[in-house]
Amino acid sequence: MMKLDEIIETLRQGKHVDEDSIYSLCVMAQELLMNESNVTHVDTPVTICGDIHGQLHDLLTLFAKSGGIEKNRYIFLGDFVDRGFYSLESFLLLVCYKLRYPDRIVLIRGNHETRQITKVYGFYDEVVRKYGNSNVWRYCCEVFDYLPLGAIVNNKVFCVHGGLSPDVLSINEIRTIDRKKEVPHEGAMCDLLWSDPEDVDTWSLSPRGAGFLFGQNEVDKFLHTNSVELIARAHQLVMEGYKEMFDGGLVTVWSAPNYCYRCGNVAAVLRIDDDMTKDYTIFEAVQARDSGGNVILPTKKPQMDYFL
């Protein structure tokens, strides 16, 4: 196996890592993640990051704009893969950082960290194109199964990919979920990864076909029950990079600028300081290139679907 720091530098350049090294990385990652709780405790200061979706060069910009992994703590809210041209390199870079700096980075599972979704939205095809088989995809999917479902910052900020669930009122209930499996089509684990905030009075069916829509009543109830001040989540494209809702009780953070190389949005990360103050850093996309090094030209009409 290549040395970890050598793999990190190779991935940062978007270059090929051999299959045996990836297998070893994924096995080590599973062993490390196996010992993490469903909801990981994180101290401040920390930087909270939203969806990445395989946009490696923008991920590198994210680290550059926010101080870097060597001196800062990070929480990534999931959706590392699919849609972008460098899903594998983006996910493996974060896995390497987790192995290199285990106390500095938390990787939460998103709705795209599943076998079913990655077979449809790009990650599976990317791996087969780059390696000629699906072995590396399988290794990564096994890591997905061990990713935690949430994080709690200073017992005051609850971090999750999607949102809330009618089956979960307390954070302690999330800790009892058996997470080490493919994401189910319904139930608490599914909802945490798929639900969205909306201006609704009560739980409503989601147009995504999974999870629920939830409003301020449910957010206020969750905040009060768990004595937390903020829900930080991702999962939805926000043109301005972040969006606060429900009197500041919830924020959506989006960290993939010019999403799908065509949407024209900026990206953001959220830093929570020791005194619990919030500071957003906004950044724009770098010039996107495909896996062959060719500049990607934006399409004229973005066509979005519900599986963000």
UniProtKB/Swiss-Prot annotation:
PROSITE patterns named among the record's database cross-references: SER_THR_PHOSPHATASE
EC number: 3.1.3.16
Cofactor(s) required, per the database record: Mn(2+)
Superkingdom in the source lineage: Eukaryota
Cellular-component GO terms for this entry: cytoplasm; nucleus
Reactions that this protein is recorded to catalyse: O-phospho-L-seryl-[protein] + H2O = L-seryl-[protein] + phosphate; O-phospho-L-threonyl-[protein] + H2O = L-threonyl-[protein] + phosphate
Keywords: Cytoplasm, Hydrolase, Manganese, Metal-binding, Methylation, Nucleus, Protein phosphatase
Cofactor binding comment, as recorded: Binds 2 manganese ions per subunit.
Binding site for Mn(2+) 1: D51, H53, D79
Molecular function, one GO term: protein serine/threonine phosphatase activity
Tagged with keyword Hydrolase: yes
Amino-acid positions noted as binding Mn(2+) 2 in the UniProt annotation, renumbered to this chain: D79, N111, H161, H235
Keyword Hydrolase recorded: yes
PTM annotation (Leucine methyl ester): residues: L308
InterPro entries tied to this protein: Calcineurin-like_PHP_ApaH, Metallo-depent_PP-like, PPA2-like, Ser/Thr-sp_prot-phosphatase
Compartment(s): Cytoplasm; Nucleus
Family, similarity comment: Belongs to the PPP phosphatase family. PP-4 (PP-X) subfamily.
Function: Forms the histone H2A phosphatase complex in association with the regulatory subunits PSY2 and PSY4, which dephosphorylates H2AS128ph (gamma-H2A) that has been displaced from sites of DNA lesions in the double-stranded DNA break repair process. Dephosphorylation is necessary for efficient recovery from the DNA damage checkpoint.
Self-association and partners: Catalytic subunit of the histone H2A phosphatase complex (HTP-C) containing PPH3, PSY2 and PSY4.
Official protein name in the record: Serine/threonine-protein phosphatase 4 catalytic subunit
Species annotation: Kluyveromyces lactis (strain ATCC 8585 / CBS 2359 / DSM 70799 / NBRC 1267 / NRRL Y-1140 / WM37)
